Each structure stands twice: as C-alpha cells, then as structure tokens.
Amino acid sequence: MKAILIASILASVSFGSRPCLAGPPSSAAPQTAASQSSGPVKNPVMTVLRAALPLRQKNILAAIEAMPADKFGYKPTTDQMTFAHLVIHIAESNNAMCAKIADIPEPKIDELKETDSKDKLLAAARASFDYCTTALANVDDSKLGDNVDFGNTQRPRVAAVFALTGGWADHYAAAAMYLRLNGILPPTAQPKK
C-alpha cells in the first residue's frame, strides 16, 4: 500500500522528465526517498511530499509571475475561470489541504477577489506555499490514516495529500496553458541557461 501511495505521489508531482527530488545533495537537507540507499525510509509519504514542495512552489510561482498583470482577467473560454481565479484557487487549496494534512487551523487571510492586483494575488499564493512548508515540517505518516472531514464525508487524512499533489500538477498545467495561449513560454518549457 505504501509503495503504491509513494508512486502515486511521485507521479503526480513530477512534471515532464524533470524529477521532483532534483537538486544538489546537502548535509543539511532533509533525508528524501531518493537519497536512501539502504533500508526503508522513515515516513516515506511525508518525506516525498516535503521534498516535492519546493520545486512545485518554484514552478507554480514562476508561472504566476510570468503572466502579465493585464492578463489576470484572461480566460480561454467564457466557461473557464480567469487566471486571477486560478491563482486564488491555488492559494486557498494550498491553505486548506496543508491545514487538513497537519491537523491545524487554516491561516486567516483577507478575502481574495479576481479584481485584486497581480502583486496581491502573487503574495497570497507565495504565502500559501510558505504556510504549507511550515505546516508540513513535522507531520509524520502515523496520522495519515485518521479520518478528517471532507465536505459532507469522512476520509483518511492521506486523501488531502493526494488532493494537494494532484492539485499542484493540475494548477501548474492550467497556468502553463493560460501562458501559452498568451504567447508566453511556461517556466518548465524555458531553455536551460
């Protein structure tokens, strides 16, 4: 079961051919599933989630930064959300899912509106990733089977892990599509420097 869960998380947080656990090794860096060469990883689900978060944060925030302020009202069709709405959704879902995973209250934030400035919406998205980093820092796998409220139903806390990682993939893909439809190359499609 844990192997399937870890594989699902890795698949949902990997964009293209770039691995989610990339980066130079550091003695101060947290131990990751990829850095283990012998024996089982302690808390593999949360270890993989925490290792994936910085790259997801980097790519999603870079996509938001890449969209010009005057295009935050853009939506591909009348039935789709605006780019600003997507950014609001990213901030709100990060806060909600990380609070659920960590079993702590969501941060209190001012209501965000689609008419808010790019700077305000970008700051809210950035703050939501910072909140996730802090909220998830000490969570271990032992509580992931506990039931938590998901709307009108109870689900294991690990459902929030799936929702969060799946959301990151979906949100980046949507932002990349909005960028491309405006003639802007998404961050992960940029040539390496």
Model-derived features: positions:
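Positively charged n-region of N-terminal signal peptides that target proteins for export
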Residues: 1-4
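Bacterial N-terminal signal peptides
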Residues: 6-18
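Solvent-exposed, well-ordered amphipathic alpha-helical segments
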Residues: 13-16, 57, 128-132
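Short, helix-capping/interhelical loops that line the mouth of catalytic, cofactor-
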Residues: 23-48, 92-153, 182-193
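Short, contiguous alpha-helical
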Residues: 50-54, 58-64, 71-110, 149-193
